[in-house]
């Protein structure tokens, strides 16, 4: 656990709940077609809230006037056939990706051999990764929403190959321990009515020889794609009786012995919330009323 312990107290802060609810209502009103968004029990989203008027502000002034020429940036939400993603243009990758797993979605006509990694043209060219960034880097293009989770249609699987759904991942991790965690997530669809998965990168601090803590990470390619120090995966599990269970994992972006049980990588959800700036528990409790968090050693 030494690989995990040092960094899991980084507090980036997040005031996300009200903005998420506002965005949710706007999205529901704008699009009546049922989809993944309408079924999510939790939506940790760093969306921009509306700009309220300020009493006593001079005529022609106030927050609304400040946005006259637009705001330089707000959270970039992207809804795909198989997942919802919040994009971080600074790192050239996702803040988080949320997907829903059900048994019927794990089988179908989706064929990985027909897929290719491709740029996300919905992201400005200044802020997106390219395949050239990964070439010769020594890192895999590691899926956040796994391709094997979405065999139900070729389009759903194709969408997992956007580079916005990818992060630089150490090959040994990607192909072994992380792959085992993805397989385990899929296996839970045999036990639970719904399995919601939220996956994302972490950039955790380390204490160095001078006794000070620093957040340092490598970047690759001409677009400076950030290499996460760790990855998290949060599983929100709906049992048939309505109970909600939560399992939250963190793995270092480094070779991990796949013989180590996955339980070893369970962490308290609070550590991920503090480190990522995201909130899960308040939104889940607002919808479910109760929650059972599974941690290492718990039954």
UniProtKB/Swiss-Prot annotation:
It is an enzyme of class 3 (hydrolase). Residues 288-298 are annotated as: Essential for deoxyribonuclease activity. Its cofactor is Mg(2+). The active site is at residue 143. The record marks 112 as: Essential for catalytic activity. GSK3-beta-mediated dual phosphorylations at Thr-130 and Ser-290 is necessary for its interaction with YWHAG and the induction of autophagy. GO terms for molecular function: DNA endonuclease activity; magnesium ion binding; nucleic acid binding; protein homodimerization activity; RNA endonuclease activity; single-stranded DNA endodeoxyribonuclease activity. GO terms for biological process: apoptotic DNA fragmentation; DNA damage response; mitochondrial DNA catabolic process; negative regulation of TOR signaling; positive regulation of autophagy; positive regulation of mitochondrial DNA replication. Its main location: mitochondrion. Keywords: Disulfide bond, Endonuclease, Hydrolase, Magnesium, Manganese, Metal-binding, Mitochondrion, Nuclease, Phosphoprotein, Transit peptide. The modification Phosphoserine is found at residue 290. GO terms for cellular component: mitochondrial inner membrane; mitochondrion; nucleus. Residues 1-48 form a transit peptide. It is found in: Mitochondrion. Its EC number is 3.1.30.-. It comes from the Eukaryota. Endonuclease that preferentially catalyzes the cleavage of double-stranded 5-hydroxymethylcytosine (5hmC)-modified DNA. The 5hmC-modified nucleotide does not increase the binding affinity, but instead increases the efficiency of cutting and specifies the site of cleavage for the modified DNAs. Shows significantly higher affinity for four- stranded Holliday junction over duplex and single-stranded DNAs. Promotes conservative recombination when the DNA is 5hmC-modified. Homodimer; disulfide-linked. Homodimerization is essential for its activity. Interacts with YWHAG. PANTHER family: ENDONUCLEASE G, MITOCHONDRIAL (PTHR13966:SF5), ENDONUCLEASE RELATED (PTHR13966). Belongs to the DNA/RNA non-specific endonuclease family. This is Endonuclease G, mitochondrial. It comes from Bos taurus.
